[in-house]
Amino acid sequence: MTLNKQQLTLNCDMGESFGSWKMGADDSVMPHVDMANIACGFHASDPNVMHDTITLANLHDVDIGAHPGYPDLQGFGRRSLSMSSDEITNMVIYQVGALQALCRAQYTDIGYIKPHGALYNDMMKSDAVFRAVVKAAALFKVPLMILASQENEKYLEIADDYDVPLLFEAFADRLYQDDGMLTPRRHPNAVLKDELAILEQVRTLADSGRVKTASGSYILLEADTICVHGDNEESIALIQKIRQSLYSGGN
């Protein structure tokens, strides 16, 4: 089988358990994705979970990405913290360095960085935060995954100052605004629930590089990868359908 013309990959946040607390269904999801965004201990995860998730990714030949977030276990990294640019850079280096060390222990490496939660959102809203994260990615010489939007060129120009490649991601199950940004989760319908709507969004992205917005308009969205979520049996089945759709071109 061959991927469609844009060769979109699937990425998923993983390794977000902590001690005896379990989150997600990584064992079931990993065989169906191309890239695993592994939590690095600040918003979720711990050294043992990180190790086990790396092992699982290696088993299924899945690219490993570092998924750093704000130091906020209780809030799952979804609350913004006021930090200086240097603090953000060092915070990201600290987390990515931990995951990279655990990767090296298994003779592998991280392939990219994708910030989590509020850090991801802040990075897309603030050029200063974006630069702080890019500086960390430059140290590890890996691409940075960010939200595909109408401002891709702006972010490419900033990242180019540090020789950091960018990976642009779209979301299978999120409602978009006309400016290409995600509808905030506090709004109703921000997360798509209907399976057919999610599959249609993925197919439209893959076939034409467009996405339907909350206003009913279509906008261009240049993406390299699609983020999926695998929290339960229903979502795992949906990931399988999304992957099949990408490989079959929707047939």
From Swiss-Prot:
SUPFAM superfamilies the UniProt entry points to: Glycoside hydrolase/deacetylase (SSF88713)
Catalysed reactions, semicolon-separated: 5-oxo-L-proline + ATP + 2 H2O = L-glutamate + ADP + phosphate + H(+)
Record-linked InterPro entries: Glyco_hydro/deAcase_b/a-brl (IPR011330), LamB/YcsF/PxpA-like (IPR005501)
GO molecular function: 5-oxoprolinase (ATP-hydrolyzing) activity; ATP binding
Residue ranges that the Swiss-Prot or TrEMBL entry lists as coiled coil: none
Alphabetized UniProt keyword annotations: ATP-binding, Hydrolase, Nucleotide-binding
UniProt-listed Enzyme Commission number(s): 3.5.2.9
Pfam families: LamB_YcsF
Any one biological process term the GO annotation gives: carbohydrate metabolic process
Function: Catalyzes the cleavage of 5-oxoproline to form L-glutamate coupled to the hydrolysis of ATP to ADP and inorganic phosphate.
PANTHER family (alphabetical): 5-OXOPROLINASE SUBUNIT A, UNCHARACTERIZED PROTEIN YBGL-RELATED
Family: Belongs to the LamB/PxpA family.
Subunit and interaction comment: Forms a complex composed of PxpA, PxpB and PxpC.
Name of the protein: 5-oxoprolinase subunit A
Gene assigned in the entry: pxpA
